[in-house]
């Protein structure tokens, strides 16, 4: 990487470690000054993944857990570019996603709320970015779900993202939301992000990405660091 393009991480664009409206952050967020850790060689190493490390259907959540039919719900295409602070593509980096199903339930032992599981949907996928830094997923639009943070609390439709970027020390975990979701105004996880940076977590509907008579398309670019970096998940 050309050091002339490096910029400081914009901490003012990220959620605070402790946000009063978000109960879990109050319980687990640090309350004492942070201690800087000296960067180690292992933090600077580039994670290497090849196509042989991924399954042919890892990017297609509508088929990678299929048992006896297609999963229920609205099919969507989610695509975008992973960029560094200079706007250059981050190539061959691993992008992982996980999400609830169309009914708003995760395949996880701790998710026991009253919504059905889909036997044909796992809710997890991964892919590598191409030479333009682009990733591509086919999935089902996730449903909203109750989460008990406050009375009548519901999480907006969202997809979790994990990216390693150019080295292990640059890993980013964030969430992607959908345009026009009325629950965004009431969600303390989304609202905990500074207002000027919230739009960076909302995908844009794209008719160009939409596949006719099959799936709606959403574009979601991710910037790993710098002045326009995508806010991280706390």
List each language-model region with its residue ranges.
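Beta-strand-dominated extracellular/periplasmic modules and repeats
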Residues: 1-234
């Amino acid at each position: 990487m050309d050091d002339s393009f490096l910029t400081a991480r914009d901490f003012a664009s990220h959620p605070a470690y402790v946000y009063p409206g978000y109960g879990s952050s109050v319980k687990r967020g640090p309350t004492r000054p942070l201690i800087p850790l000296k960067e180690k060689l292992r933090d600077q190493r580039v994670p290497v993944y090849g196509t042989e490390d991924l399954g042919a259907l890892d990017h297609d959540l509508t088929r990678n857990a299929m048992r006896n039919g297609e999963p229920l719900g609205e099919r969507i295409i989610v695509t975008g570019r992973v960029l560094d602070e200079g706007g250059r593509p981050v190539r061959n980096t691993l992008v992982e996603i996980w999400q609830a199903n169309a009914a708003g339930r995760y395949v996880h032992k701790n998710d026991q709320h009253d919504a059905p599981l889909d036997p044909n949907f796992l809710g997890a996928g991964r892919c590598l970015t191409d030479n333009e830094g682009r990733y591509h997923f086919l999935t089902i639009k996730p449903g909203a779900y109750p989460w008990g943070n406050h009375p009548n609390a519901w999480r907006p439709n969202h997809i979790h993202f994990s990216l390693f970027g150019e080295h292990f020390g640059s890993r980013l975990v964030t969430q992607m939301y959908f345009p026009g979701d009325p629950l965004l105004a009431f969600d303390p996880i989304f609202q905990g992000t500074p207002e000027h940076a919230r739009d960076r977590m909302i995908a844009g509907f794209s008719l160009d990405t939409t596949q006719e008579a099959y799936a709606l398309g959403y574009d979601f670019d991710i910037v790993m660091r710098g002045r326009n970096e995508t806010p991280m998940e706390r």
